[in-house]
Amino acid sequence: MSWTVGILRASQRAGTVRANFLCLGMAPSPCPPAATPLGGAWAVAPASKMATVKCELMKNFTSEEPVRNSKISIVGTGSVGMACAVSILLKGLSDELALVDVDEGRLKGETMDLQHGSLFVKMPNIVSSRDYVVTANSNLVIITAGARQEKGETRLNLVQRNVAIFKLMMSSIVQYSPRCKLIVVSNPVDILTYVAWKLSAFPQNRVIGSGCNLDTARFRFLIGQRLSIHSESCHGWILGEHGDSSVPVWSGVNIAGVPLKELNLDIGTDKDPEQWKNVHKDVVASAYEIIKMKGYTYWAIGLSVADLTESILKNLRRVHPVSTRIKGLYGINEEVFLSVPCILGESGITDLIKVKLAPEEEARLQKSAKTLWDIQKELKF
């Protein structure tokens, strides 16, 4: 944060009132004559030697109004929230980064840590507070906060507890940044994206779930490992739920336009002698494996969220598999959010790509929707 100390001294000359403001902040400001003592009856803060040093160091010509091109706020400074913050900072995607968390000690510590490294990421304005006013006028708000599942707790009960948390978050976010876009990262992400959409009353293009963007990255990485090809050159999608019922679209997997299904008709099925279906199994299992070994997954999701952020704030119109409302598509009639390929730009989700799925893939997507709806229909708002 930047801390500003203002010292006001009034003097009257020739019937006019002149006010001098001495600021110990980033914006330049006029300085009083060196012989004039600071303070007096009008002082609102104690005099500081730094005021003299600043005035000796600089000659001010005009006041400077802060110009902000973009502002990102992150709600939640746990491992995932901070991985998102660092990934965004390293990409230089905004002029201001605001952090919000209920844990004041952790929040202050994480903020100071980032501020001390701001020289290396060219980001001078990193602010934080427990109060959502710090998020005011955000272009993008990223939600990583939420309740964790307790031992033996049902998924429905976990989601219901998160609904209560999201009610508090969304009312403040909407109050201070009514035109922002939302990226929901908290799990279960598809259901909580639906919750955020319902509570915010934002149009669906401005409420985005991180969804299967990371699942797809894992999928492409593992395909690339099998073929000894960089994952960027492996084209394939994971759609549906971010979780166990996700759908690998084997019918569309290709390398340089060559569909792998033309080379192996049984790819991704039980009849496949190469057992490519294990690639998707590894995608689903990988998060559990990482959690078992190190406790959390956060770096990959942080990089994934920064990738989505870049597409939105730079209006790149890239296609990402993110969670959005898909009622009326693929035979799905429930009010659910699932990942499908979407074009992301400055308005959020500008378009949805109507991917042609094989019958068995569409059936799995419908099953994924039912899994989510069975929980959503029981939620109390």
UniProtKB/Swiss-Prot annotation:
Query: Is Transferase tagged as a keyword?
Result: no
Q: In which residues is NAD(+) bound? A: 101-106, 148, 187
| Catalytic activity annotation | (S)-lactate + NAD(+) = pyruvate + NADH + H(+)
Entries under Pfam families matching the protein = Ldh_1_C (PF02866), Ldh_1_N (PF00056)
Instruction: Give the signal peptide as a residue range, or say none if absent.
Output: none
Q: Which GO terms describe its biological process?
A: lactate metabolic process; pyruvate metabolic process
Q: Which InterPro entries match?
A: L-lactate/malate_DH, L-lactate_DH, L-lactate_DH_AS, Lactate/malate_DH_C, Lactate/malate_DH_N, Lactate_DH/Glyco_Ohase_4_C, NAD(P)-bd_dom_sf
Q: Top EC class per UniProt?
A: oxidoreductase
- Listed binding positions for substrate are 155, 187, 218, 297
Involved pathway(s): Fermentation; pyruvate fermentation to lactate; (S)-lactate from pyruvate: step 1/1
What's its EC?
Answer: 1.1.1.27
Q: What's a single GO MF annotation on this record?
A: L-lactate dehydrogenase activity
Q: Which UniProt keywords apply?
A: NAD, Oxidoreductase
Example GO CC term: the record gives: mitochondrion
Give the record's family classification: Belongs to the LDH/MDH superfamily. LDH family.
Q: What is the designated name of this protein?
A: L-lactate dehydrogenase A-like 6B
- According to its UniProt entry, this protein's organism is Bos taurus (Bovine)
Kindly list the organism's lineage.
Answer: Eukaryota, Metazoa, Chordata, Craniata, Vertebrata
The gene name reads LDHAL6B
